[in-house]
A protein has these predicted regions:
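Extended, non-globular alpha-helical segments
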Residues: 12-27, 32, 108, 114, ...
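Leloir-type glycosyltransferase catalytic cores
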Residues: 84-141
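Structural alpha-helical scaffold elements that stabilize or flank donor/cofactor-binding regions
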Residues: 39-40
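A donor-sugar binding/catalytic signature common to diverse glycosyltransferases
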Residues: 43-90
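Cofactor-binding loop segments of dinucleotide-utilizing enzymes, especially the Rossmann-like FAD-
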Residues: 1, 70-72, 102
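Active-site donor-nucleotide binding/catalytic segment of nucleotide-sugar enzymes
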Residues: 1-16, 27-32, 75, 79-86
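Short acidic loop-to-helix transition motifs that present clustered carboxylates
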Residues: 30-36, 53-54
């Protein structure tokens, strides 16, 4: 989630080091043209990514591709649709979906756009607007 104001994985470097040792290629989809993103996702056997719009690219994956979504534990009713949208997309696409639950860390400074359109109460309470820490033992793919 490079460049994002929230849902960053605080220990991302530790995770990417583990994944590289397991043979994963680490990419930032935002740095690729859409046709390159399609090719990358279409040729992947496994995708591991934090919750965010880049996961929409899983629609280009072959059936049976394993999708590992890193995300917080959403607990509020208003977070229900957020919680399951990529799981539903994976299931509709015939993919194998797995969730890696992350602990949350408060964000000190929310983006101006978030502060303009989202109530302070939601920004402060919702896991959607926090950063994440993943237990390294959970990266056992």
């Amino acid at each position: 989630r490079e460049g994002s104001a929230y849902r960053k994985v605080v220990n991302e470097n530790d995770i990417t080091n583990i994944l590289r040792k397991k043979g994963f290629k680490i990419i930032n989809p935002q740095l690729y043209k859409i046709d390159e993103q399609i090719e990358i996702f279409a040729n992947a056997d496994k995708i591991i990514a934090p919750h965010g719009s880049n996961l929409a690219n899983i629609i280009f994956c072959d059936p049976e591709t394993k999708i590992f979504e890193i995300g917080p534990n959403y607990i509020f009713d208003f977070e229900k649709n957020i919680k399951t949208k990529y799981e539903k997309l994976a299931n509709l696409s015939g993919l194998k979906y797995f969730k890696i639950n992350a602990d949350t860390v408060n964000v000190k400074n929310h983006s101006k756009i978030a502060m303009k359109y989202v109530s302070k109460k939601i920004l402060d309470k919702s896991s959607h607007f926090k950063n994440m820490i993943v237990k390294l033992s959970d990266i056992d793919l």
